[in-house]
């Protein structure tokens, strides 16, 4: 989704010029404390995020790896995927925290920041009329497409199992898996 990445990049630049961007960066995002790297809660949360965002707990990466050819450089690809996943998360923070401080939204953040991006982006972009609304629609539309296409990968595990165990064609294995999961 290069277009979504480009929109994220543009939003990072836009957020950097908001009135209280520096305050948002220094207070919430770039306030680095080395002691927190040894905090067991933070370590658990970091692993939880990695397992969630890379779908490691349900075997998606293992299933994808089974389709790679023998010459694939797995360590290099793992580093690239991890880097891009971290970069997108950092970009989301670089967008979210300036909006929180500029538009006084600190009270809307709970202990869990899940969904914060989805409340701050509309608020921040809503202040900029039609252009802001168009950017919000593009962002959320592309985020929706990215989420749906990522969900398709979750079907690959039962589909590949049905193909391997019962020698089904991919089309029928996909239909059966879809019906069992979503019916």
List each model region and its residues.
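Membrane-embedded translocation segments of transport machinery
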Residues: 2-148, 152, 166, 172-173, ...
